[in-house]
Curated annotation (Swiss-Prot):
An annotated GO cellular component: extracellular region
Name recorded for this polypeptide: Omega-scoloptoxin(13)-Ssm2a
Major localization listed first in the record, in broad terms: secreted
Highest rank taxon of the organism: Eukaryota
Record-stated family: Belongs to the scoloptoxin-13 family.
Location of the protein in the cell: Secreted
PTM section of the record: Contains 4 disulfide bonds.
Swiss-Prot/TrEMBL keywords: Calcium channel impairing toxin, Disulfide bond, Ion channel impairing toxin, Neurotoxin, Secreted, Signal, Toxin, Voltage-gated calcium channel impairing toxin
Tissue specificity annotation: Expressed by the venom gland.
Signal sequence residues: 1-22
Statement: the UniProt record of this protein carries the keyword Cytoplasm: no
Length: 76
């Protein structure tokens, strides 16, 4: 009889763990979607020294030491 209770307890624990992991993965997915919607696509203007380009792109084409060269960077 103790084996049946232990088996039921193990099943309940596993089911609860799966639910918690599914909620965390959904939360991560929503954050990733929000980031992708707010990132700057390829060819878009970006601010120097800022990480606003979409994943896999970099803000290039400007001199970070020249204060007059603002707004000329592009996500590439």
């Amino acid at each position: 009889m103790a084996y049946i209770y232990a088996l039921i307890f193990a099943i309940v624990v596993c089911m609860n763990t799966d639910v918690i992991q599914a909620e965390e993965s959904q939360h991560d997915t929503l954050e990733n979607v929000e980031y992708r919607l707010s990132c700057i696509p390829k060819g878009g203007e970006c601010e120097r020294m800022a990480d606003t380009c979409c994943p896999g792109l970099q803000c290039l084409g400007c001199n970070p030491f020249n204060k007059e060269n603002l707004g000329k960077c592009k996500c590439q």
